């Protein structure tokens, strides 16, 4: 606190653990002569009162790092003496007030990390004295205002992580005092702006994750003070200008995830470089041994570098300071002694060798531990990795060096040819958090080599697609896991009762489990996904799971579940599949009334659009019957919804409450014995894409409102007792005639257009032998036409899954981690 003539003019309460609301009764509002007010890094909440705009003498106002919410009051535009305004890292919403353009003395305006929307006000261009403008991490849209041309004194401009569009304005080239420019994670387009080369004071330039195209200019060396250059995840083409890599001050360089090509002469790169990320481009040729000159590298990413031959991994042995090394998918076949290779490094934390054809020399790490020299002491310490990815390398043995890796957190050796038993010592690694052993040929688990009371801190384990036999491993089920995936094995017996109560995802589908679902599942309050498909479970419908408020996916298909299904409450259920069981009885008319997320999801569509279920570590996957085909969704969009009750023994009418599920995408009720009319309420399913009610005993008309469902691309009404004209909507006219066959009472112009029968009825299907043979040939041709694109699609999806890193790996192993150390320099 600072006073002048009995008046408090300066009040600094930053980092004082204060909380609560700032209301009109707060003593602060009696200090009308304040010039400096800093309440940053506290726990204040609620809205800012407009009366704060009455502090007419304020020159500095800092409310950053609190929990303030609501809109930024326009009255702040009355603080005409203000030179610094910092509202960073709060929960402010709404538009940026145009009145802030009145603050003509402002030099710092920091509004980042809020929830602000709308366009950037044109009036901010009036702030001609601004040196620092930060609007990052909001939801701002539109183009950069032309009025920004007046902000010629800017030294720092951060517009990153918004939804801004258009090209970078040419007047940016006149910001000759600019030191840092960040526009990453927007939707900017166009070529690299040549006029940016005039910014000779520029130290940090981040263009990442936009839609920039074209080539990089050859004379990048004019940015002679450049330290950080991030332009990853764009569509830049051509070669990397050698002048850019030669800038002496350059420390961090990221051009990964573009379409660059050509060769790279590593010997000409600035020796001060600490981070070099070039992965996921179109580079071809050998990795030259001159890379060994980059002795100051901490991070190196050359993933998807098409070497077209073997690699001598010893060329990396001089890079002793490396912390993160990414060498995945190099299109190489080589032999590597992991012990010898790893002993070259002092501080290696992350190693990614996935997607290569590696023959690993697998020495025992107990008798030959991986060690690294400690200069000046003549001693050696074991090298301890935290993250190791050997996925898809064709290795046949479990890597023995892992036995001594006491700091290992993330381990992925999936998609290999490793057989035998999972070693018991694996579970003794104290920091192990993520283990992926899927897609190998493991047969079992060695005896746990720890006391029964010992609990690892593991969050994720996948042993899917192996040859595990016997019971579900009780000791793994008891781990404090968030995700346990053991699908597609040969596991048998009953569920253990001691399943982790921290689970979010449990997938044991495609095994031979018997008995009933354990009632202990009801204690897993965080469970989001339960998949037990294709087992031999014999039980009634688990109504008791309705107490799990977070349950979003329930897959019981292809078991021996039986009995009726009564009205129950599943408020967050998005996907349910109970097909291929023995459920029977009628479904009450109000059966779906408490499945609220399927008729409220659209209200939060912007929140979930593009998001997938799972976490940064893993993605949930399921098989759904969609549009007449079984499709494997390797990642589940949060906005996807599906109800599949097919191939059971349900009877009676289809519940009218089905019409409440306005956000439903897939509905399959086929192969039951439903009777009565198709509910007209189905016409309210505005998001429906696939509808299958075939092979029931439905009667009456097809509701005409179904013709108005614009997303309905697939439908099957065949093998019922339906009558009357087909709806006239465009979607109906594009269906195959087989979608309506075996319904004797259909007629009308829509049916004639669909089936092109011109007067024939659906019963007149018999034809002479030659015509029948001809139709059979045509059917085979049609099947082949459908089959070939299916193969192409499958190969394409396989390529994508094999060649691109899973989301969890990019989040945990990827460049974001390495960037965090340098971003503080901005």
Curated annotation (Swiss-Prot):
One of its GO terms (cellular component) is plasma membrane. It comes from Arabidopsis thaliana. This is Receptor-like protein 18. The gene is RLP18. Disruption phenotype: Enhanced susceptibility to pathogen Pseudomonas syringae pv. phaseolicola. Its main location: membrane. InterPro entries: Leu-rich_rpt, Leu-rich_rpt_typical-subtyp, LRR_dom_sf, LRR_R13L4/SHOC2-like. LRR repeats lie at residues 5-31, 32-54, 55-79, 81-103, 104-127, 128-150, 151-177, 178-198, 199-223, 225-247, 248-271, 273-294, 296-318, 319-343, 345-368, 382-405, 406-429, 430-452, 455-478, 479-500, 501-524, 525-550, 552-570, 571-594, 637-661, 662-685, 686-709, 711-734. The keyword rRNA processing does not apply. Pfam families: LRR_1 (PF00560), LRR_14 (PF23598), LRR_8 (PF13855). GO terms for biological process: defense response to bacterium; innate immune response-activating signaling pathway. SMART domains: LRR_TYP. The chain crosses the membrane at residues 781-801. Keywords: Cell membrane, Glycoprotein, Leucine-rich repeat, Membrane, Plant defense, Repeat, Transmembrane, Transmembrane helix. Belongs to the RLP family. The keyword Endoplasmic reticulum does not apply. The lineage of its organism: Eukaryota, Viridiplantae, Streptophyta, Embryophyta, Tracheophyta.
């Amino acid at each position: 606190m600072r006073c002048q003539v009995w008046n408090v003019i300066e009040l600094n309460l930053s980092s004082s653990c204060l909380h609560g609301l700032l209301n009109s009764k707060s003593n602060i509002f009696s200090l009308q002569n304040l010039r400096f007010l800093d309440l940053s890094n506290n726990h204040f909440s609620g809205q800012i009162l407009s009366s704060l705009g009455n502090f007419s003498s304020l020159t500095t106002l800092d409310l950053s790092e609190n929990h303030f919410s609501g809109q930024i009051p326009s009255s702040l535009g009355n603080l005409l003496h203000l030179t610094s305004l910092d509202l960073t890292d709060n929960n402010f919403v709404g538009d940026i007030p145009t009145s802030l353009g009145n603050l003509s003395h402002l030099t710092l305006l920091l509004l980042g990390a809020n929830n602000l929307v709308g366009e950037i006000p044109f009036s901010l261009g009036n702030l001609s004295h601004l040196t620092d403008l930060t609007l990052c991490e909001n939801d701002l849209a539109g183009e950069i205002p032309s009025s920004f041309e007046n902000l010629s004194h800017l030294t720092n401009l951060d517009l990153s992580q918004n939804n801004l569009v258009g090209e970078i304005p040419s007047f940016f080239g006149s910001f000759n005092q600019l030191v840092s420019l960040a526009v990453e994670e927007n939707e900017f387009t166009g070529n690299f702006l040549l006029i940016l080369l005039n910014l000779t004071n520029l130290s940090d330039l981040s263009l990442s994750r936009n839609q920039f195209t074209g080539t990089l200019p050859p004379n990048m060396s004019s940015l002679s003070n450049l330290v950080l250059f991030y332009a990853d995840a764009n569509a830049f083409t051509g070669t990397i200008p050698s002048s850019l890599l030669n800038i002496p001050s350059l420390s961090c360089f990221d051009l990964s995830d573009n379409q660059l090509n050509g060769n790279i002469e590593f010997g000409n790169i600035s020796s001060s470089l600490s981070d070099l990320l070039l992965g996921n481009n179109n580079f071809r040729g050998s990795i030259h041994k001159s890379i060994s000159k980059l002795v100051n590298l901490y991070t190196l990413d050359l993933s998807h570098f098409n070497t077209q031959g073997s690699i001598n991994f010893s060329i990396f042995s001089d890079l002793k300071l490396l912390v993160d090394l990414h060498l995945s998918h190099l299109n190489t076949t080589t032999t590597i002694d992991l012990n010898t290779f790893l002993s070259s490094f002092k501080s290696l934390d992350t190693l990614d060798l996935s997607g290569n054809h590696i023959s690993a020399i697998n020495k025992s790490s107990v008798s030959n531990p991986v060690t690294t020299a400690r200069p000046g002491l003549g001693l050696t310490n074991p090298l301890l990795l935290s993250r190791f990815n050997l996925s898809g390398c064709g290795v046949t043995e479990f890597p023995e060096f892992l036995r001594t890796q006491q700091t290992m957190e993330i381990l992925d050796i999936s998609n290999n040819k490793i057989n035998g038993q999972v070693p018991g010592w694996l579970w003794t690694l104290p920091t192990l958090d993520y283990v992926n052993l899927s897609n190998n040929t493991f047969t079992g688990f060695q005896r746990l080599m720890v006391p029964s009371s010992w609990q690892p801190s593991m969050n994720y384990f996948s042993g899917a697609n192996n040859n595990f036999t016997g019971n579900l491993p009780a000791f793994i089920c008891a781990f404090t896991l968030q995700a346990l995936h053991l699908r597609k094995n040969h596991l048998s017996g009953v569920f253990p009762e001691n399943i982790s109560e921290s689970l979010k995802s449990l997938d044991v589908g495609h095994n031979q489990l018997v008995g009933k679902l354990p009632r202990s599942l009801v204690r897993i309050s965080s469970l989001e996904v339960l998949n037990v498909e294709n087992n031999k479970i014999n039980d009634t419908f688990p109504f008791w799971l309705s107490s799990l408020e977070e349950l979003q996916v329930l897959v019981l298909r292809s078991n021996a579940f039986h009995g009726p299904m009564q009205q129950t409450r599943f408020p967050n259920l998005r996907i349910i599949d109970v097909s291929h069981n023995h459920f029977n009885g009628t479904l009450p008319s109000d059966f779906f009334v408490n499945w609220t997320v399927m008729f409220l999801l659209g209200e939060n569509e912007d929140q979930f659009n593009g998001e997938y279920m799972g976490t940064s570590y893993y993605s949930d996957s399921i098989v759904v019957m969609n549009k007449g085909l079984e499709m494997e969704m390797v990642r589940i969009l949060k906005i996807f919804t599906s109800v599949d009750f097919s191939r059971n023994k349900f009877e009676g009418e289809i519940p009218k409450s089905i019409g409440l599920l306005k956000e439903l995408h897939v509905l399959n009720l086929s192969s039951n014995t439903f009777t009565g009319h198709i509910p007209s309420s189905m016409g309210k399913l505005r998001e429906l894409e696939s509808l299958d009610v075939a092979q029931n005993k439905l009667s009456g008309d097809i509701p005409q409102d179904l013709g108005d469902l614009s997303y309905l691309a697939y439908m099957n009404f065949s093998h019922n007792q339906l009558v009357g004209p087909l709806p006239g909507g465009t979607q109906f006219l594009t269906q195959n005639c087989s979608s309506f066959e075996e319904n004797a009472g259909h007629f009308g112009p829509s049916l004639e257009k669909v089936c092109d029968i011109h007067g024939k009825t659906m019963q007149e299907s018999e034809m002479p032998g030659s015509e029948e043979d001809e139709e059979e040939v045509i059917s085979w041709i049609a099947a082949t036409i459908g089959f070939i694109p299916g193969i192409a699609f499958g190969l394409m999806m396989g390529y994508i899954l094999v060649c691109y890193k899973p989301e969890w790996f990019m989040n945990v192993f990827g460049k974001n981690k390495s960037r965090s150390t340098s971003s503080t320099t901005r």
